């Protein structure tokens, strides 16, 4: 977990923006790239660099490995309709994403931990795979035994808002996926560029 957090902060500094909107992100104090050359003048950035940075931002944001993310994109590319929207729908319909987006946990890392420890159900059945994909109408719920976990209690008592494609019931600790979102529906705290992700992978297909 510590390694993951260090990596996420590194990506935030490369983007010069807090990827999750966290006030604890060191980018707020060191708004330059990491490493000994972080303060050096910025050279002209190539298209490939921008594309690679875009796909890395998405991978880091959703905590997905390279191979798994490539598989997600491949599925989005083969699907009907707009590839960018397909990609976002697949990423946002993961159980870890829905739980995080509901506001019932403070971070996507907390969501993943609850899921892996079998504290979460989907339609009443325990799910311990973070990449489990939900369908419209599916209900995710935090189990009773996790109701007193400090980060869950704090999140449930907060006034955080959830996007319109989710229906949250804080008393029942549940969230329902009403509709698969498109890119413009998702409240990213930083600029995310799925079009560059499409360009990145399209050149490899």
Curated annotation (Swiss-Prot):
HAMAP family: Ribosomal_uS4_B. One of its GO terms (molecular function) is rRNA binding. SUPFAM superfamilies: Alpha-L RNA-binding motif. Residues 93-171 form the S4 RNA-binding domain. One of the primary rRNA binding proteins, it binds directly to 16S rRNA where it nucleates assembly of the body of the 30S subunit. With S5 and S12 plays an important role in translational accuracy. One of its GO terms (biological process) is translation. Keywords: Ribonucleoprotein, Ribosomal protein, RNA-binding, rRNA-binding. InterPro entries: Ribosomal_uS4, Ribosomal_uS4_bac-type, Ribosomal_uS4_N, S4_RNA-bd, S4_RNA-bd_sf. Gene3D superfamilies: Ribosomal Protein S4 Delta 41, Chain A, domain 1, RNA-binding S4 domain. Belongs to the universal ribosomal protein uS4 family. The keyword Ribonucleoprotein applies. Part of the 30S ribosomal subunit. Contacts protein S5. The interaction surface between S4 and S5 is involved in control of translational fidelity. It comes from Neorickettsia sennetsu (strain ATCC VR-367 / Miyayama) (Ehrlichia sennetsu). This is Small ribosomal subunit protein uS4.
């Amino acid at each position: 977990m510590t390694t993951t957090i260090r990596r996420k902060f590194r990506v935030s500094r490369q983007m010069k923006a807090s990827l999750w909107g966290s006030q604890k992100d060191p980018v707020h104090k060191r708004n330059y790239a990491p490493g000994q050359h972080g303060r050096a003048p910025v050279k002209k950035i190539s298209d490939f660099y921008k594309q690679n940075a875009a796909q890395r931002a998405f991978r880091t944001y959703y905590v997905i490995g390279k191979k798994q993310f490539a598989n997600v994109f491949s599925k989005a590319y083969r699907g009907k309709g707009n590839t960018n929207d397909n990609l976002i729908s697949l990423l946002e319909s993961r159980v870890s994403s829905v739980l995080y987006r509901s506001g019932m946990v403070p971070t996507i890392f907390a969501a993943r931990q609850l899921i892996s420890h079998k504290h979460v159900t989907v339609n009443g059945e325990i799910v311990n795979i973070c990449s489990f994909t939900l369908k419209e109408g599916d209900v995710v719920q935090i189990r009773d035994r996790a109701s007193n976990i400090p980060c869950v209690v704090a999140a449930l008592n907060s006034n955080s808002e959830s996007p319109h494609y989710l229906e949250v019931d804080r008393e029942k600790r549940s969230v329902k996926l009403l509709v698969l979102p498109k890119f413009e529906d998702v409240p990213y705290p930083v600029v995310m560029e799925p079009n560059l992700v499409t360009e990145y992978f399209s050149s490899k297909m």
